[in-house]
Regions:
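Surface-exposed, charged secondary-structure patches
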Residues: 68-113
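Short, well-ordered alpha-helical segments enriched in acidic and aromatic residues
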Residues: 41-57
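Low-complexity, intrinsically disordered terminal/linker segments enriched in charged
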Residues: 129-153
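A solvent-exposed, acidic/Ser-Thr-rich amphipathic alpha-helical stretch
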Residues: 62-67
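Bacterial N-terminal signal peptides that target proteins for export
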Residues: 1-9
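A short, surface-exposed beta-strand/turn
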Residues: 113-124, 130
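Bacterial N-terminal signal peptides
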Residues: 9-18
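Short, low-complexity N-terminal intrinsically disordered segments enriched in polar/charged residues
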Residues: 19-37
């Protein structure tokens, strides 16, 4: 009897782990964390992983290949990869999320924007874009007409 009682906690643990795997969903943070882990070694594999979360992207293989090639060409000009940091996370309801990161390189940063959608119970990457215009956006944001003290409410 005591042997049986000792095995109950282990059985309960395995049962609960099974439930979290079955009912748990991948979060957008888990997707981007894995994306950047892959990205540090192979940017093309990271993009493939991101879009693998969306079954509909199989129909856009040419566009994904083009995206990977253009990003590689840009990366080749930017120097060594130095890491990343999240800039913002915006939501529209409970099923749409846009997450923006700065990807740091020796020469200049690149902005990555992930657009996630959850049609049912699982987040998927619906769109991914990148650009190097973060400096222009910051410059625009600091223009006098955008400053709080110059806004007439």
């Amino acid at each position: 009897m005591t042997r049986f009682l000792k095995t109950i906690p282990f059985l309960l643990l395995f049962f609960l782990l099974g439930l979290t795997k079955t009912f748990g969903q991948t979060t957008t943070q888990e997707i981007t964390d894995k994306f950047f882990t892959l990205y540090s070694k192979d940017p093309a594999k990271a993009i493939d992983y991101g879009f693998s979360t969306n079954k509909w992207m199989d129909r856009k293989l040419d566009a994904v290949t083009d995206l990977k090639n253009k990003l590689k060409n840009l990366i080749d000009l930017c120097g060594d990869y130095c890491g990343y940091e999240m800039l913002s996370e915006k939501t529209a309801g409970q099923n749409i999320k846009m997450v923006t990161f700065i990807v740091k390189y020796d020469r200049e940063p690149i902005r990555f924007t992930f657009f996630f959608y959850k049609p049912k119970d699982k987040w998927q990457l619906n769109n991914f874009s990148y650009d190097e215009d973060i400096d222009k956006d910051l410059e625009e944001a600091t223009k006098a007409y955008r400053l709080k003290e110059n806004i007439n409410w």
